[in-house]
């Protein structure tokens, strides 16, 4: 057993007390990103090593791997702790997104180590989508590079408000303060163009030598700020979803027998209580919450992030992909939207193309109407393009086959974020973040016969996994 873990368990008075203490620690999800070879994997390895999160057998294996694949001479190559793929070790780079977990006495952490090469930018966007904070590594010898700008923009585009600019490899520039100050000034000049109200901090460090990672550096006495670990332990993460209106995307209709009908999913934002009036979109039908069922039994109230099953007092038509919200909330379904897109496919995105899109539990089709612009990552300017290439980022106008209950992504990432799926290969080809909503033509002018409506209701009630569209909502809209 890890000696530090054993000591923590002993200090808490046993395994059970230690596990209870762990449950009450706050959780910080963060990612490391930046240009290739800036030392992202080495930094994570250093964090794990210096917080004593590495077991003895892992340390022994690391010594052996450093001899075979290491790039640091006689020193331990800490990057090998997270570069797990054979291709990564052979090339000395990160390709896939690697997740690692560790904890200190103050906080629990989930780390996403993302690739630095431009051709793996799509992997980086995947890692950033669930994080609260981004560590942007900059090689002290190279300064701010294009990929640094790209990752900064993607991080903020995906809603990350806390950026820690870690100026790495200070040992290779003699730990000079003027180098740190110059890069800091360059990045702040660039950051003026980034969207949102950002919390940006700067830490000079050496991941290889351990300077200012978990302990203060004796080589940079001119720096009086916190270490990287201290920043991670103390940064105040205010999750906006806790303060947002209630949103509950239905992922599954749970009907184990004739006496029970519940709607399972994860509460995306806000809270819900037993007895609360709720509304179902896109139909607009209202009911009230009879029970909140969880793995641990019934609850009176549930908060954002909890996986629950809601039982309603009325037997109404709800299927996978529908959205439940408070009855007094207004959210008009929309068929047209402007979407910030990170394109991840070799074939460019162009007007006239159609893709399947998935939003929370809802899956439908969408058509690309126009590309307003592509972002030039070098200077964040907008330029006109006819198509969006691989790793391109731009604003795209889309029309959905049916009205969707959408939020602006910056307000609610779950109900404002979607993915593009190729209809032939079923491969995810892009990620989208809702920027603007256009409610015109939210409901198509289509008339259905009484038989069609009855058959549709029957299919939706007894075969919810078919994801049949609610034709009744279309009829009301047409009327």
Swiss-Prot record:
Residues 168-171 are annotated as: G4. GTP binds at residues 34-41, 113-117, 168-171. Residues 206-208 are annotated as: G5. It comes from the Bacteria. InterPro entries: CysN_GTP-bd, CysN_II, CysN_NoDQ_III, G_TR_CS, GTP-eEF1A_C, P-loop_NTPase, Small_GTP-bd, SO4_adenylTrfase_lsu. This is Sulfate adenylyltransferase subunit 1. Heterodimer composed of CysD, the smaller subunit, and CysN. Residues 34-41 are annotated as: G1. Belongs to the TRAFAC class translation factor GTPase superfamily. Classic translation factor GTPase family. CysN/NodQ subfamily. GO terms for biological process: hydrogen sulfide biosynthetic process; sulfate assimilation. Its EC number is 2.7.7.4. Keywords: ATP-binding, GTP-binding, Nucleotide-binding, Nucleotidyltransferase, Transferase. It catalyses: sulfate + ATP + H(+) = adenosine 5'-phosphosulfate + diphosphate. It comes from Salmonella paratyphi C (strain RKS4594). With CysD forms the ATP sulfurylase (ATPS) that catalyzes the adenylation of sulfate producing adenosine 5'-phosphosulfate (APS) and diphosphate, the first enzymatic step in sulfur assimilation pathway. APS synthesis involves the formation of a high-energy phosphoric-sulfuric acid anhydride bond driven by GTP hydrolysis by CysN coupled to ATP hydrolysis by CysD.
